[in-house]
Amino acid sequence: MTNSADTSNAVSPFQQTGAQEQPIHRIRIIGVPLDMGASRRGVDMGPSAVRVAGLEARLEALGHEVTDGGNIRVEIAETQASGNEKAHYLEQIAETCKRTAEAVVKTMEEGMMPLVLGGDHSLAAGSASGAAEFYRRRGEKIGVIWFDAHADFNTPESSLSGNVHGMPLAALLGLGPDGLAKIFGYAPKIAAANTALIGVRDIDAGERENIRRAGLTAVYTMRDIDERGMRAVMEEALSVAGRGTAGYHVSLDMDWIDPEDAPGVGTPVRGGATYREAHLAMEILADHGQMRSFEIVEVNPVIDEHNRTADLAVELACSAFGKKIL
């Protein structure tokens, strides 16, 4: 098809990568150096480690327009009282999540996709809330794809540790303290019917009850991946998250991956996704083209090996944003 208009200076929304065209994204990196949700220190350096691993340059090499929005202001644990023993630093974490949510909304209002770097997983109560709020203002809703070794479905009442990084998914589905669950004044942010949890292999007894109470059924354990394969699990999960929604928020906890490939995480669990399974999951996300916001959390360079986990995080981000083998 020809067009008489002069398009010599136009920017195409697609780039050619191999046999398929991939959309070009305007991406804003948002760092959240939060570690108060975890008991093991060091994950606050995760955003820097992922940046040092070349995230911005690698995404730009794929043709994306990338800007770095810097870091969200986060309180330092050593200067704060931990407060409630059933939810350590809850007040400070809730404030950080609110700031993160507002930054995500602003990013999306400016036509960019948020790429949030953690930090511990408690920040996701903010990032996913921001994405949900952006679409709520448009009369739409989103789903969520949650890659994690853990369910993150505790509340202060069910938690055995009081670590808030074990609570964000429950908060997004309306369970738990208002400071996490009711950012922007309402809950839930995500419907259970549009939520998919992938790769879980360590669930507390209280979380099982919370999952039943919330009506969450799309929980894919590592056994499901072993028996059915990553593609079948991903296709079903994306159908769940995409049903009647404008797309989905993707939350990637690096402990979802087996610690042989991702050693630099605070709560490693043996038997996770392999290197190639993780890449395949990200590649399928890119193929579907419905990802609306993305985050990588729980990279802990203090316990990493030569920045291997941060390097892998960058590789997986590239796959999620369209990098192909051929």
Model-derived features: where do they sit?
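Internal, active-site/partner-interface "lid" segment
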Residues: K182-K189, N194-V200
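Catalytic cores of soluble, metal-dependent hydrolases
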Residues: T2-L34, R40-L115, L123-S127, F134-R137, ...
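A general structural motif
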Residues: G176, A196-D204, A232-M234, T274-H279
